[in-house]
Amino acid sequence: MARGPRYKVPFRRRREGLTNYRKRRRLILSRKPRLVVRKTNKHIIAQVVVAKPQGDVTIVGVDTRALAKFGWRGDENNTSAAYLLGLVAGYKARLRGVREAVLDIGLHRPVAGSRVFAVLKGALDAGLEIPHGEEVLPEDDRVSGKHVAEYAAKLKEENPELYKARFSRYLQRGVQPEDLPKHFEEVKKKIVEHYEAKLAKAVAQ
């Protein structure tokens, strides 16, 4: 309830927990495209957005479902998928002429090593220039899913039934979770080769 003559009713999107307008203003004043990262219960979304007087214009929009094109059969909402998504988004942005951006994680908490920063790491590796601190980026072992593989291997030995239940989605897709780092590297290689070829072709034209 509003109280007192100086009380200001927050904007609707702020009341609904959708937009931090102070942070958004700082990002817009940077005059750089924004790498917008959002999470849902099942997927992760990355967009490269430019602020215009008439409203935001989305230059690139992609989510982790697009990774299936490159053979990804792992979870679509984990750290590995987040990194690969950032890699794809970064390359797509470069193909559209974007060279630099600022990270926009909205109301997500800025937890070092989290999935939103895995997207950032992927975009950086794709060649985008984005201001950041190295301490927020997840370690390579975590990005590749090594921690998942180690846990899966241990669980498979100690409790095969729980292993099958916990990793049923991986197994249904034909991926042994203990082989996740290898699968990750294979998909990463496909993405890099695909977009590097496109970039080379664009330069040659």
Swiss-Prot record:
Record's keyword annotation contains Transport: no
Name of the protein this chain belongs to: Large ribosomal subunit protein uL18
Q: Which GO terms describe its molecular function?
A: 5S rRNA binding; structural constituent of ribosome
Q: Name one GO biological process term.
A: translation
Protein family (similarity comment)? Belongs to the universal ribosomal protein uL18 family.
Species in which this protein is naturally found? Pyrobaculum neutrophilum (strain DSM 2338 / JCM 9278 / NBRC 100436 / V24Sta)
Q: Could you give one GO CC term from the UniProt record?
A: cytosolic large ribosomal subunit
Q: How does it assemble?
A: Part of the 50S ribosomal subunit. Contacts the 5S and 23S rRNAs.
UniProt function note: This is one of the proteins that bind and probably mediate the attachment of the 5S RNA into the large ribosomal subunit, where it forms part of the central protuberance.
Instruction: State the UniProt keywords alphabetically.
Output: Ribonucleoprotein, Ribosomal protein, RNA-binding, rRNA-binding
As recorded in UniProt, coiled-coil segments are none
